Every structure is written in C-alpha cells, then in structure tokens.
C-alpha cells in the first residue's frame, strides 16, 4: 500500500534523472522465475516465494472472474501472471517489467476487479496510460473480464473529445464509473475542475509507466492526479521496457513493492517469434513487400513506416495493387483513429499500415506478421513493434527491410541489445508452421 512518504514523492525535482532510493524490501524475480532477493524480511510486502500455478483457478478468484476467464479461453497463466497475481490481488504494490505479449494487462485488470466492491458514484480504480488507443483497449479488457459483474461500470477519458460528455457521464449516478481508464492530461483537467472525485480510489495503475513518467509534463499531471487520491491505496506499474534510469522515479510512487522483471533486460524479444531481415535498395521495397504479402500466410499483418506521409502513400499503393489496407497514424482526427483501430481489430481489414502510434501496447489477437517497411530509429522501439505479432506466447513472424547504413546500425544495436540473432530471410521463404499456430 502507498501511504507514508507521499510528501517525498511530490517534492522531488522534475529534472532529477537518478534518485538513490532505499528499496531493500523489494523483490526481483529473474527470468527463471526464482526469487532474486536474499529471502529476508519474509513478512514484508514484496517477499515473494515462487508460486507456479497450474491454472487460473489456483488464484481463488471471484466466480464471476473465473467464468469470464474461461469464456476468453485462458487456461494457464503466463509467467508474469504466475509471479504477480497471487500478491497483487491482496493489495501489494507492483513494479513489473515483462516483454510484450505476456498478459501484463490481465494482471492489473484481474487484480483490481478481484478487490473491487463497487459503491454507486465512487471511483475505486484509476488506470493511466500514455496513448488514447491503449486507454480504449484497456477499457475493453475491463469490459471483457467484468461481463459477469453487471454492477461494475468502466469509463475511458482521453484528450481530443468533448469534455462536456465526460462531465455528463460522471455526474449521472446511473453512468458514473467505478473504474476510470484515462490519459493523464484529460484526467488532470477533470480533477482540476472538480468534475471527478478520486477520494475513494483504492487502486492506482500506470501502464507503459516508462513513457508516462519520462516526459516531465505528463509526470507532473500524474503527480497532480496522485495527490487527489487517498494515501492508503495500491499502486501498480507495468511496462515492456523499464530502464535503470526510470526505475527510481517509478519507486517514488510505491511502498515496499513486489518487483517483477521477467527475463533480464537483454532478452526481451519474444519466444515463438521468428525474426528475419531483408537487405535491399529503397526503390525495391514496394516490390518486395508485395511479394511477401503474396507469398506469406497470415491472419493479419501490421506494416510499420517512419512518417505519416509514407503511411498514406503506401496504403494508397497497396489498395491500388489489390491489397485492401487501412492506415493509422497520429495526425488523423481522434474519432477516425479509434474507428480505424476498431475496424482492424474486428477483422474488417487484414492489412494495417501504421506509424509508431501502434507500436506500443496495442493488442490485436489475430496479428501474426509484423513488417518493418522502415526500420525503427532505436532498438527499444523494435521490441514494441514486433511485439504486435506473437502475442501471449503464440507464434509470429517479424521481417525488417534494411536499405541503408543507418538501418544496418539499428539492426546491429537490436541484436546486441536483446541478445538475439536476426537472420537473413531465406530465398525459399519460411515454413508457415514455424510462425502460424495450428
């Protein structure tokens, strides 16, 4: 629980990049699932000894949650879920870094729903994230797992929409949410204008916490929201990448947290994901992309480009070449972005061309092919991009088109950063059984 020491959090310098924190009570879980701490302070929060559950039933969740989990087809928890849920459902603060596709969202959704005792008109859970699409997706996960909890109401708030609609929803006792999923800027505005009461919040979650807290303006918004909540609450933070520099900042919000680092930082690439590169000239990319789309078997594919202009032009070319495609980027109207995201998620299109707006956190189950038409500028972004394929430990295929010296350098950094060997795409192609789930 986070309570004492909140003043220290709220007074730290915004330009402080490294903070020395006494965090000896926290526990780190290494990639092999064994406890990394020395085992002392066994009665304190974070002193976790390995529990390897064979099924979600072992977590002793509410019957309503168990039914929803069965409906979703989940039988066995992932590694991060095994390590985290047994403690998080009892209110333990959590700092969790685990690779994409391991079900981090389900950890905090199930944990907060398990603890939720809905009171009409009271917000009990706040979830913050950095992207509107991600907020929308998290809201949908809450709806999916709370389907047998009819009294639970969830709402999503983000910028670019009419604030009056948010206020109307909040002031109506019939629609006022118990769970709020939001981007920091919009929620801060609602708090500032006294349009939302956070004095009853029991769970405070930050998803993609590194992105949320590394930007000073967004971090200030989070602090203002944090001040509006009670001192006695659970705080949980999650991300696929969590640098050594950002961890002390995260810990300022936490008290004696359970720290879960599933797989060490050098091995964050996904199990089951086949990764290849193709070396070619820039002018050869369109022909090679068409060949790949013709030759490869896939359910849905996401193609990453480096700019809005290239996204629009490539989508036009694909549609003209009889490859029905949809594009999503950050420069379109908010309503249009959400509509296109929904259309792709609901399988109305099999091909999506996107900038990095879809490169972090977005979860669409049918994607099993990711193509870097343009290489990312940094190694971490590669992880988030290719993580769209092979979600939840399933198979997938990632192909990167390498056309410049800069691309070669990024490819080398990716292999060094994640301790992975990315091989050249075979001329004869690849066996579909290596990247398709049977």
UniProtKB/Swiss-Prot annotation:
Pfam family, one: DEAD
GO molecular function, one term: RNA helicase activity
Location in or out of the cell: Nucleus
Cross-referenced PROSITE patterns: HELICASE_ATP_BIND_1, HELICASE_CTER, Q_MOTIF
Entry binding sites for ATP: 98-105
Record's keyword annotation contains Ribonucleoprotein: no
Acidic residues compositional bias, start-end: 1-19
Catalysed conversion reaction: ATP + H2O = ADP + phosphate + H(+)
Residue positions of motif DECD box: 207-210
Every Helicase ATP-binding domain range: 85-260
Domain Helicase C-terminal, chain residue ranges per copy: 272-433
Gene3D superfamilies named among the record's database cross-references: P-loop containing nucleotide triphosphate hydrolases
Keywords in alphabetical order: ATP-binding, Helicase, Hydrolase, mRNA processing, mRNA splicing, mRNA transport, Nucleotide-binding, Nucleus, RNA-binding, Spliceosome, Transport
Listed InterPro entries: DEAD/DEAH_box_helicase_dom, Helicase_ATP-bd, Helicase_C-like, P-loop_NTPase, RNA_helicase_DEAD_Q_motif
SMART domains xref list: DEXDc (SM00487), HELICc (SM00490)
Known function: ATP-binding RNA helicase involved in transcription elongation and required for the export of mRNA out of the nucleus. SUB2 also plays a role in pre-mRNA splicing and spliceosome assembly. May be involved in rDNA and telomeric silencing, and maintenance of genome integrity.
Protein name: ATP-dependent RNA helicase SUB2
Source organism (scientific name): Eremothecium gossypii (strain ATCC 10895 / CBS 109.51 / FGSC 9923 / NRRL Y-1056) (Yeast)
Name of the gene encoding the protein in the UniProt record: SUB2
